[in-house]
Regions:
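Electropositive phosphate-/nucleotide-binding environments in soluble metabolic enzymes
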Residues: 13-17, 51-54, 170-174, 202, ...
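Catalytic cores of alpha/beta
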Residues: 55, 119-133, 183-186, 199-216
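Active-site entrance/lid segments in N-terminal catalytic domains of soluble metabolic enzymes
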Residues: 1-130, 134
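His-Asp phosphorelay/catalytic-motif detector in bacterial-type signaling
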Residues: 107-108, 189-191
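Glycine-rich adenosine-cofactor-binding loop
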Residues: 190-191, 195-200
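Glycine-rich phosphate-binding active-site loops on the catalytic face of alpha/beta enzymes
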Residues: 76-78, 137-146, 198-199, 205-232
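Glycine/Thr-rich beta-alpha phosphate-binding loop at enzyme active sites
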Residues: 79-90, 127-189, 231
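Short catalytic-loop micro-motif centered on adjacent basic/acidic residues
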Residues: 111-114, 194-195, 217-218
Length: 237
């Protein structure tokens, strides 16, 4: 489908000191009033317990805050990896434990969690109830994981699942946003939503905000058009 991507680069990272310096440099160059959100994720080692994974998340969040982040976005999903950090949002108990540790690490900073696609509304609700006491916002949807075939029907990427982004997932994103907006409304929760995934034009921004989103992020759309956000802000929606 035109305008859609099969994303396969995982979550590579430089050593912590490198990105800590980068965050500090970025913060020093931002104009007053700009909000710097830094995305962090754990790096699980083979055999790590969920408590050890939570400690790594918390450590990275504290590093980000100490380096100048105004808020921290913890990545609980990556559709291109099979490790626990990439699927954390699908395990409500583990997600709640990690969210609690993150909140302890950065008690005075906004905490956002980025999640992937839920296929089951009850699983989504269990996740929401587990993390809602600890977070300020949820960011969704971080791609849809599926196998990809070429024009001849042959599996690509050695049959491994990849994250699909772009136009192909837009309807799924709005459906999931509607679920979570309902959870928030029914429980009078203060958790806010940030829309991402499949959004690439002014009309998408308007629809996401109309469904209760506090803000909208661009991912693959901004790779194709780095000036997209500025253009929408300038021209309105």
């Amino acid at each position: 489908m035109e305008g859609s991507w099969a994303i396969s680069f995982g979550m590579p990272s430089k050593p912590p000191r490198f990105w800590q310096d980068d965050v500090a440099a970025t913060r020093s160059r931002l104009a007053k009033g700009k909000f710097l959100s830094v995305s962090v994720v754990a790096t699980p080692e083979p055999g790590d317990t969920i408590d050890e994974v939570a400690s790594d998340y918390a450590r990275c969040a504290r590093w980000a805050a100490d380096s100048g982040a105004d808020g921290v976005e913890a990545n609980f999903s990556c559709p291109n990896v099979s490790s626990v950090d990439g699927q954390l949002y699908l395990n409500a108990a583990d997600a709640g434990l990690v969210a609690a540790r993150l909140r302890e690490a950065i008690p005075d900073k906004p905490l956002l969690l980025k999640v992937g696609h839920f296929t089951d509304r009850e699983v989504a609700l269990a996740f929401f109830e587990a993390v809602a006491p600890y977070v300020d916002a949820l960011v969704m949807v971080n791609g849809v994981s599926t196998c990809v075939r070429d024009e001849q029907g042959e599996l690509m990427f050695e049959g491994r699942c990849r994250g699909i982004g772009g136009v192909a997932i837009r309807d799924l994103v709005f459906e999931q946003l509607a679920w979570f907006a309902g959870f928030i409304r029914e429980r009078a929760s203060s958790v806010r939503l940030v829309g991402v995934g499949g959004l690439g034009q002014a009309a998408d921004v308007a629809q996401a905000l109309g469904q209760g989103c506090e803000a909208v992020q661009f991912a693959t759309a901004a790779m194709l058009n780095p000036g997209l956000g500025l253009a929408i802000r300038r021209e309105g929606f």
